[in-house]
């Protein structure tokens, strides 16, 4: 139907006849001449119709925005002074000789070049229109390049692309499962996989050795800007490699991809223990572009009369930390400080104590804060420890350790972005030495990653001191976003049963949920491990998108709904009867 894409029309085609197909991006009448900006996925070409072509000109007068047309004409240079250097096709135009309307269009719900003023709900409702925008098509094209690059890299390194089941059974992986009722097995349900975790481990036990899959995964959880109920994961697993070797391969993949697709040379990824990341940055995925750090000051405040500080300072499960913002005392207004106080409240902080350092040499008189008089004896060593200078402001977090880390960690990131403190464009790292377990709040333990992560200690220590046991897990972080997480897996059945027992999963429950895995571990299991990338997050970062919804063709909203198809929706009662499902009305509170 066509000889060229619109974006291919350039000076090399001058005096040649071309046939183009696409959407009318814009139609203009200038002095009796009709101009059509014709758009396809590769670009926009200007087509000109003059009155000399009577029938064709009359047809061109009927054209409106978003009509789908086929045009044939001769390529010529634009008149002097009319070139558009902002377009790759801007030096030429097509003098139209033929025109065929392939499809008409209603008035669009929004102009494609005015999308900034259009609400996201409207864009998602008419996603097929939204995706016509060059910005959106370019993101999809780039995503395709990323997946192609990943496949080529892994194929070239001996990995085998293997598909794993979508209909499987529910396993405890941290989030709620999407359940699928079975028609043929009454009262039983499949679960959509949160990850291919167990199947890829079974593939290692099957001798596949190196596996990968670009897999759809599903989690029924509360959504944020970087979460979707269904998402795409680059899943990787290897046999007979330790964590350093796995990290080396996957780091090389990311660095090569950034170099070849973005012309960005990422540095070697530094490695940081989990405990250091939490202490210095309040996060297990720190954004190292921001030159602000948390500093422990609790040991300086154990004897002050101010219980807001001394209480947590004397509690082993609490923390008092300081966050110094250089020149922040000069930069921030009282209203801004109040706004940041409200912000940390989102994370459970009861307030945001601060000290403004006006003139350090004047001692207490050079400080501005309602708390200074309560901690006067500790002021000098405190200022020295945080490196305070004139003009600074020092914020404090004083609460349970988790609250302090989350509140000051989030404040650190917000200050970095609000005040444009980012020192570099890209800051990758590995976070390593994660704890195996964390308290579940009910006297038990839950796995930091998942129950199949190998510990870095023997079974005896794991059983005697689970609180201090470390895992052989590792997370790849870029600009404060977790790109991927992985670990060396347990390949010994006794160790696996021990971990499940510590997690409160008894022998009967373990057999019922994981019997197939426990059996497989007893038939010769190689040491193995792997990593999974979030493809959506990776493409979001590489394209500079604000949300993963911008790099997914048909995403869900934050309420897990498709605005275009109105999914999820009601189903025919007959289908429910076939599945032996009866809906119960939820009782409304009086």
Curated annotation (Swiss-Prot):
SUPFAM superfamilies: Class II aaRS and biotin synthetases (SSF55681), GAD domain-like (SSF55261), Nucleic acid-binding proteins (SSF50249). The record marks 30, 81 as: Important for tRNA non-discrimination. It catalyses: tRNA(Asx) + L-aspartate + ATP = L-aspartyl-tRNA(Asx) + AMP + diphosphate. Residues 197-200 are annotated as: Aspartate. One of its GO terms (cellular component) is cytoplasm. Belongs to the class-II aminoacyl-tRNA synthetase family. Type 1 subfamily. Aspartyl-tRNA synthetase with relaxed tRNA specificity since it is able to aspartylate not only its cognate tRNA(Asp) but also tRNA(Asn). Reaction proceeds in two steps: L-aspartate is first activated by ATP to form Asp-AMP and then transferred to the acceptor end of tRNA(Asp/Asn). This is Aspartate--tRNA(Asp/Asn) ligase. It comes from Hahella chejuensis (strain KCTC 2396).
């Amino acid at each position: 139907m066509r000889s060229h894409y619109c974006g291919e029309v350039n000076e090399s085609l001058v005096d040649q006849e071309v046939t183009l197909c696409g959407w009318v991006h814009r139609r203009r009448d200038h002095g009796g001449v009709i101009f059509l900006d014709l758009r396809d996925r590769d670009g926009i070409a200007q087509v000109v119709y003059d009155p000399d072509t009577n029938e064709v000109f009359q047809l061109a007068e009927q054209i409106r925005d978003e009509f789908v047309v086929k045009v044939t004409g001769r390529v010529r240079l634009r008149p002097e002074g009319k070139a558009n250097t902002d377009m790759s096709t801007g030096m030429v135009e097509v003098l139209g000789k033929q025109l065929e309307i392939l499809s008409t269009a209603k008035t669009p719900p929004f102009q494609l070049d005015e999308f900034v003023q259009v609400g996201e709900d409207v864009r998602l409702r008419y996603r097929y229109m939204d995706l016509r925008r060059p910005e959106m098509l370019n993101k999809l094209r780039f995503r395709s390049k990323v997946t192609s690059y990943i496949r080529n890299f892994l194929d070239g390194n001996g990995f085998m692309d293997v598909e794993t089941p979508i209909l499987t059974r529910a396993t405890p992986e941290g989030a709620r499962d999407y359940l699928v009722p079975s028609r043929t097995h009454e009262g039983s349900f499949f679960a959509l996989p949160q990850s291919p975790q167990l199947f890829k481990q079974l593939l290692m036990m099957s001798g596949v050795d190196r596996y990968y899959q670009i897999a759809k995964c599903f989690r029924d959880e509360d959504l944020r800007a970087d979460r979707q109920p269904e998402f795409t994961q680059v899943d990787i697993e290897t046999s007979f490699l330790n964590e350093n070797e796995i990290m080396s391969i996957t780091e090389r993949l990311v660095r090569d991809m950034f170099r070849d697709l973005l012309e960005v040379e990422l540095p070697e990824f530094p490695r940081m223990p989990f405990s250091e990341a939490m202490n210095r940055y309040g996060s297990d995925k720190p954004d190292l572009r921001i030159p602000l750090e948390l500093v422990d000051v609790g040991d300086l405040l154990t004897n002050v009369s101010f219980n807001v500080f001394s209480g947590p300072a004397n509690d082993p499960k609490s923390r008092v930390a300081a966050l110094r913002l250089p020149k922040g005392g000069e930069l921030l207004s009282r209203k801004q400080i109040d706004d940041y106080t409200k912000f940390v409240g989102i994370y459970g902080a009861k307030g945001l104590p601060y000290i403004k350092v006006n003139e350090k040499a004047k001692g207490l008189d050079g400080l501005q804060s309602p708390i200074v008089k309560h901690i006067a004896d500790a002021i000098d060593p405190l200022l020295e420890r945080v490196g305070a200078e004139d003009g600074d402001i020092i914020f404090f977090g004083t609460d349970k350790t988790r609250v302090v880390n989350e509140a000051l960690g989030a404040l650190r990131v917000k200050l970095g972005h609000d005040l444009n403190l980012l020192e570099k464009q890209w800051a990758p790292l590995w976070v390593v030495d994660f704890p195996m377990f964390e308290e579940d709040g009910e006297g038990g333990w839950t796995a930091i990653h998942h129950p199949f992560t190998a510990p870095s200690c023997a079974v005896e220590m794991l059983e005697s001191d689970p609180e201090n046991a470390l895992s052989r897990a590792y997370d790849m972080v870029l600009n404060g976003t977790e790109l991927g997480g992985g670990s060396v897996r347990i390949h010994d059945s006794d160790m696996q049963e021990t971990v499940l027992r510590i997690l409160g999963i008894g022998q009967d429950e373990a057999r019922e949920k994981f019997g197939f895995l426990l059996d497989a571990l007893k038939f010769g299991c190689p040491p193995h491990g792997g990593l999974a990338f979030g493809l959506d997050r990776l493409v979001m970062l590489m394209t500079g998108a604000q949300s993963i919804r911008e790099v997914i063709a048909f995403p869900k909203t934050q309420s897990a709904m498709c605005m275009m198809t109105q999914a999820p929706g009601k189903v025919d009662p007959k289908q429910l009867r076939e599945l032996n499902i009866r809906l119960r009305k939820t009782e409304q509170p009086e």
